[in-house]
């Protein structure tokens, strides 16, 4: 298995999380969109405790703006200013690192003041100016592989970031288009992208999404979260990305492919066992 140089992610307490070969599994998890600060706190606090118990590193994720929703009427989030303020309070009060996605260059500066990791959405993974601006922020950059991009083509995205001065790059596999309104996961992409000396994270929830499959919104098949996550762990990933909600059926964004908060501990416990078996 390829040895990947760990990426350091700052924590509120001043220490670093290390993501890569020989390091604890990373979980990036939280609601798709920051529906409310209270909901975000509930998820962050609960998942943080679970991860500490299981020896998993944790970064809380929630979007302040979902700029790529299927319909104009879809809920997008609290917006840049309010959303970042909520994320800053969650970070400080719960002492958990935070990540969110940016959609244009103007958001990089404000986001970098709050976020511990800047995320590039899948649809924007080839946007050179956005990647360069994110790299120059000095923060670790988590790039989601577009559903339309091959794993080997992501070496170009890494090249843009590294050329702009960043050596803190992580990649996320979130499935590939399989005809219309469907995604599949090619597990070969995980070792391919790790071969670029870059930690690779598997998006366990977006990978089971059915994009636009519900007409005015996306649908999903959350029953496949567990088996595909086990396969990704066995393939040697460095981390997992999960959208987590207390009541996915009532979520304002990506509910059909989110995992329920009360199911997280059971799933992570199984995945830790799979990782331990693979590492023996």
Curated annotation (Swiss-Prot):
Its main location: cytoplasm. GO terms for molecular function: 3-deoxy-8-phosphooctulonate synthase activity. One of its GO terms (biological process) is keto-3-deoxy-D-manno-octulosonic acid biosynthetic process. The keyword Cytoplasm applies. It is found in: Cytoplasm. Pathway: Carbohydrate biosynthesis; 3-deoxy-D-manno-octulosonate biosynthesis; 3-deoxy-D-manno-octulosonate from D-ribulose 5-phosphate: step 2/3; Bacterial outer membrane biogenesis; lipopolysaccharide biosynthesis. SUPFAM superfamilies: Aldolase. It catalyses: D-arabinose 5-phosphate + phosphoenolpyruvate + H2O = 3-deoxy-alpha-D-manno-2-octulosonate-8-phosphate + phosphate. Its EC number is 2.5.1.55. It is an enzyme of class 2 (transferase). InterPro entries: Aldolase_TIM, DAHP1/KDSA, KDO8P_synthase. Keywords: Cytoplasm, Lipopolysaccharide biosynthesis, Transferase. It comes from the Bacteria. GO terms for cellular component: cytoplasm. Belongs to the KdsA family. This is 2-dehydro-3-deoxyphosphooctonate aldolase. The lineage of its organism: Bacteria, Pseudomonadati, Thermodesulfobacteriota, Desulfobulbia, Desulfobulbales.
